Amino acid sequence: MTSSKLTLEPNAREELLDHVREGASRDPPAEVCGILAGTGNTLSRILPVSNVADEPRVAYELDPQETLTKIESVEESGDSVLGFYHSHPESAPVPSATDREQASWPGYVYLICSPDGRMNAYEWTADVFEPLEISR
């Protein structure tokens, strides 16, 4: 990411919140996750990916094969992978200790969302999550 700001196109924001709310409505609630795609610092679409974590209520793990397939489709479309998203269905949209331990894509956006519509974006620097401004 070359900017300290992430712009969300309205359709991408709505798709994202729909996915987050769908996960939160499960019994028990589950974190959802996926890929952020667009150009520059503008998020134009999301690509949901199955959460294969052992405890999806409190953790996420992107399905590796599905992630690879979707990354290839983003690249073939001419868009770029901007980063990844996941939800916190029962807590604030801030990086947890687990999020910090598992972050592995320096320079990419990590977007964390809550079902109530709150969301925060960060760039992982390989050491810390640097907050990004979100604009609509």
Predicted regions and their residues:
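Conserved beta-strand-loop surface patch within small alpha/beta domains used
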Residues: M1-V81, E90-R136
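Short, well-ordered beta-to-alpha junction loops that form the rim of enzyme active sites
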Residues: S87
